[in-house]
Design a protein with these regions (language model features):
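An N-terminal-biased, well-structured beta-alpha scaffold segment characteristic
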Residues: 1-76
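Phosphate-binding beta-alpha-beta segment of Rossmann-like dinucleotide-binding domains, i.e.
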Residues: 79-121
Length: 121
């Protein structure tokens, strides 16, 4: 069994992909692997049992890669994992910039409350 220690909130759906016959998540025992998002590991004292660090996200700025390499700890990240979120934000930005959507929302909020608004609109 390998013990995976998580930092930050890791999605339950993602954790379900681990074979529970081979991996234990956040057990009270020394970690074999570390899974994190934005948690800063630069001041972290790595136990000798750690074999790998995996970041759920792009980049490794929060992981002391050189220190890990010296200790034989492999570092992974997941570039492109947030690609869908980036696409959604780009499309939303295009819509918001192409039409006065935000201004229209504010205009609607400023309208006086009326009982027969459905008939008027």
């Amino acid at each position: 069994m390998f013990n995976i220690q998580t930092f930050n909130a890791i999605a339950k759906e993602g954790l379900k992909t681990f074979d529970l016959e081979k991996y234990v998540i956040d057990a009270n025992q020394p970690a074999d692997g570390i899974l994190l998002r934005s948690y800063n590991l630069h001041d972290f004292d790595f136990p000798e049992t750690v074999k790998a660090v995996a970041r759920a996200g792009a980049g490794v700025n929060n992981i002391p890669v050189e220190n890990c390499s010296e200790k034989g700890i492999v570092v992974f990240n997941t570039p492109g994992a947030n690609a869908n979120a980036v696409k959604e934000l780009v499309l939303a930005s295009l819509f918001v910039s192409a039409r006065p959507i935000l201004e229209g929302t504010e205009w609607v909020k400023e309208l006086p409350a009326e009982d027969d608004v459905e008939q008027k609109v």
